[in-house]
């Protein structure tokens, strides 16, 4: 009986020592958090292994993460996965659909982004820029001829329109002369002519019936205007005037002292014509409503695909600039030792307990052997 008791006692003692040894060894990975001193000498094994090597551990984990986990190839492969593209597209489309149910004006949107009085500031900025650019244009182009400033396409278009202008002029003149107003105007001109020529005019008036003579002039005037020679003459005059206009320098038409006033006036006209109230106070959703289906089905998938492709193509530069190793190291360094211990225990708690139990089993086995050896030796 004493033999069995001795063996069991040795097994219990060995198991207890083995379990406690492993338990203490595990605890010494984290504890104590700080170095302990006795008689101004640091106590051995303090602080614990992880607190002592914390900085090195953080640095090596960062390097391992970048070298073996978040590699450029791994990131690129993940970004180019169809499932990821599909998930992001669905998420963006869902967010867009939710926003389309609201009514948000550009003014409100810019206000949310911290841009106060967006409409007023934008109009003020546009006004300043326009006036500055117009003044600049008038200054640097003042010695340029008009044919240099007018676009070639517009110049050709205007030249082709000159015959039409001639036709319109002759048509309007014919209608005017044939009208009662035209007849009255001719009659008044004849009467004025006679009055201005004194006795000769009075004598001529005795032999000429102003009414019938006015009608005759009216008829002949209409015929004269519609003759090809007259039309050619008018067209030639218009062409000559147009060429003279093109040959003039800008400063001849707009003197330097009037440039500022003209720039201000043009700017004012442009600002008044600019539909800023509609642009800034109409809900964005109203503007996009007609394009909602196209945005969801085409623009969002295309934008997501291009974005992921761009990030994947430049993943090496992005990873390098982000310095992921340093980022991981910094994040680990911000963890308190208590948090690190808790994290490790939560992840490996069961395995750590098994190590403790294994120490107890091995210790018990060694105790049995020691008990047997103690009895027989």
Swiss-Prot record:
Positions of transmembrane segments: 1-21, 357-377
Signal sequence residues: none
Pfam families in UniProt: DUF445 (PF04286)
Tree of life domain: Bacteria
Subcellular location: Cell membrane
Disulfide partners: none
Keywords assigned by UniProt, alphabetized: Cell membrane, Membrane, Transmembrane, Transmembrane helix
Annotated Gene Ontology cellular component terms: plasma membrane
Membrane topology label: Multi-pass membrane protein
Family: Belongs to the UPF0754 family.
Protein name: UPF0754 membrane protein lwe2241
Native source species: Listeria welshimeri serovar 6b (strain ATCC 35897 / DSM 20650 / CCUG 15529 / CIP 8149 / NCTC 11857 / SLCC 5334 / V8)
């Amino acid at each position: 009986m004493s033999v069995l008791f001795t063996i069991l006692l040795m097994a219990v003692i060995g198991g207890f020592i083995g379990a406690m040894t492993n338990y203490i060894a595990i605890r010494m990975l984290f504890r104590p958090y700080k170095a302990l001193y006795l008689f101004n000498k640091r106590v051995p094994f303090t602080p614990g292994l992880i607190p002592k090597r914390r900085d090195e551990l953080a640095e090596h984990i960062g390097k391992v993460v970048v070298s073996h986990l978040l590699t450029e190839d791994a990131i690129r492969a993940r970004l180019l996965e169809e499932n990821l593209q599909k998930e992001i597209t669905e998420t963006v489309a869902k967010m867009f659909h939710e926003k389309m149910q609201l009514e948000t004006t550009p003014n409100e949107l810019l206000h949310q982004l911290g841009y106060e009085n967006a409409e007023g500031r934008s109009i003020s900025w546009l006004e300043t820029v326009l006036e500055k650019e117009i003044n600049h244009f008038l200054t640097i182009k003042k010695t340029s001829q008009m044919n240099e400033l007018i676009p070639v396409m517009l110049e050709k278009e205007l030249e082709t329109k000159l015959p039409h202008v001639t036709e319109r002029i002759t048509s309007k003149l014919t209608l005017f002369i044939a009208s009662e107003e035209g007849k009255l105007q001719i009659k008044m001109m004849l009467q004025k002519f006679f009055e201005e020529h004194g006795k000769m005019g009075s004598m001529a008036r005795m032999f000429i019936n102003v009414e019938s003579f006015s009608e005759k002039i009216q008829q002949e005037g209409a015929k004269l205007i519609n003759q090809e020679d007259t039309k050619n003459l008018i067209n030639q005059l218009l062409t000559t005037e147009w060429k003279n206009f093109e040959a003039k320098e800008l400063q001849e038409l707009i003197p330097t002292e009037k440039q500022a006033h003209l720039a201000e006036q043009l700017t004012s006209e442009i600002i008044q014509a600019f539909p800023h109230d509609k642009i800034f106070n109409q809900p964005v959703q109203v503007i996009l409503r007609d394009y909602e289906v196209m945005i969801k089905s085409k623009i969002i998938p295309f934008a997501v695909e291009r974005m992921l492709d761009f990030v994947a193509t430049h993943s090496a530069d992005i990873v390098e600039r982000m310095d992921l190793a340093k980022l991981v190291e910094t994040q680990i360094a911000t963890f308190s030792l208590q948090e690190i211990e808790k994290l490790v225990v939560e992840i490996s708690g069961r395995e750590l307990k098994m190590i403790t139990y294994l120490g107890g089993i091995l210790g018990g086995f060694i105790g049995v052997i020691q008990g047997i050896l103690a009895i027989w030796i």
